Regions:
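Vicinal oxygen chelate
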Residues: 5-13, 43, 64-137
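N-terminal beta-strand motif that seeds the catalytic metal site of vicinal oxygen chelate
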Residues: 1-16, 74-75, 129-137
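Acetyl-CoA-dependent GNAT
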Residues: 59-64, 128-130
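Short, solvent-exposed loop/turn elements at beta->coil junctions and helix N-caps
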Residues: 33-35, 62-63, 103-106
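Short, charged/polar, Gly/Pro-enriched secondary-structure boundary elements
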Residues: 50-56, 119-122
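Alpha-helical elements of the RecA-like P-loop NTPase motor core of helicases
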Residues: 19-20, 86, 123-124
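Core segments of cupin and vicinal oxygen chelate
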Residues: 2, 9-54
Length: 137
């Protein structure tokens, strides 16, 4: 069998804040939670309908994420329209989390913005990339 990408696991300082961020801004829901101690508590989150395909695994015990401005490493989420990118950016700015304001780029980047999650990870929201909603435009 060919390997299949199933999850991305990363440490977070405050599990409750991180779960709230990914629920509010990315629409993810908890599908699994296990562990009890401060170093073994994990929460699995995914999108509706993708429970058996791909999950984010949030692991308690992170130190925070330091990322240089020139480092474009990020988690990417597609949204259904440019106005949805603008709406995420507006809510992110109000919460003090906006890292990249909305901007249009040539294909394949599309229209995008990014927020910093509670640990400092960049989370991109895009429309018009060749993946997800807007891929056909």
């Amino acid at each position: 069998m060919k390997p299949v990408f199933t999850h991305c696991a990363f440490h977070v300082r405050d599990l409750e804040r991180s779960v709230a961020f990914y629920r509010e801004f990315c629409g993810l829901k908890i599908v699994e939670e296990h562990g009890e101690g401060p170093n073994d508590h994990a929460v699995w989150m995914t999108e509706d309908g993708r429970e058996g395909e791909y999950v984010f695994v949030l692991l308690l015990g992170g130190l925070g994420h330091q990322q240089r401005d020139a480092d474009l490493s990020h988690f990417g989420f597609a949204v259904g329209s440019k106005s949805e990118v603008d709406e995420v950016a507006h809510r992110g700015q109000a919460a003090g989390m906006l890292a990249w304001p909305p901007k249009a780029f040539p294909f394949p980047v599309g229209y995008r913005c990014a927020l910093r999650d509670p640990d400092g990870y960049l989370v991109e929201f895009s429309y018009g990339q060749p993946l997800g909603p807007g891929a056909e435009t």
